[in-house]
Each structure stands twice: as C-alpha cells, then as structure tokens.
Amino acid sequence: VELADAAAAASPKAGPRMLAFLAGQQAHAAAQTGDRNRALRYIREAETAMDRAESRGKAFGSYDPASLNYHISQVRYELGDVSGAIEAMQQSDKVRYSVYRRARVRHRAMLAERQLEIGHLEAACDTWHQALDDYPMVQSGRADDRVRTMFGLLRPHLKNTTARDLYDRARTIAPPSLVS
C-alpha cells in the first residue's frame, strides 16, 4: 500500500490515464490488506479518471479499460467477490486489444481458475482452451506458471471428459516440465 501511495503522491500532475493506473494500483493494494472502503474508493477514482481519459481519445499502449477492468477484478477477488471478479475479468478480456497476447493468456488462465473456484468446470475448461490458443506464441514465465497451475487444478477432474480433453490438449502444447 505504501508503495502504491508513494507512486501516486510522486505524480501529482499526471494525466488521467496515469491517474487511473495509480488509483487502480492503490485499490488492489488496499484490497490485499483488507481495507474494503479504501479499495472501493480508489476503484471509483480509477473509473472517473478512465472516463476522463477515454473522452480525450484512445491511447494505444497505455492504461486502458482492459487494464482498469483487470484491477477491478483483482480488487473484487481480494474482497471475496469471486463472481464479481469473474465478471470484471470477462469484461477486461472483451475490451483488450488483440496484440496483448501475453496478458490475454495469463488473464484468461486466471479467469479459468476463478471459474473453477466457484464450481464452473465446463466454463473454466472453455476459458483455458482460449488461453491455450495463444500460449504457443508467447514466452512468459508467468504464463508458464498459469499453465502449470492449470495442470494441477485439472488433475482431480480428469474423469470429466471436458477436463480430460483439455488436459490432453495442453500436454501437446506445454513443455513437459510444466506437466509434472
């Protein structure tokens, strides 16, 4: 929280996109420490700043609505609202620029983990399949970590045909070191 607050304090003249980013970081940090009111206040600040930024026009390659929805998802998750986190992550995926393949793989895998957490195995498998579509085209340790996690989460469900099909497909795509 202190780092996020320090970054925001060091940028008093930042533009609305940067303010949205910083408020999103502060919201996530506050949520991680259990400060619900502060987290929600910072999310509102981030949304307001993003509205101002979007009214000025699109800025490819900077903090955008997909990033804001990612932060909203993280805050909701940290505050125990898994369904709300899933909705925000789905919205993030919907508005993310197609060139952000690495983030798409990681965030879709995270979305699948959350879908599984609330018992939606079929939806999780569909989302993991989408993540695997892009996975061979990225090089990312964090994406690898998500694929490794996927294998572990799927193992208890391998009697389910959908889960087994996903597991088998992933084994043909992922490096053997991630399957162990």
Regions picked out by a protein language model, each given a short descriptive name:
Residues 1-180:
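Conserved binding/catalytic microenvironments
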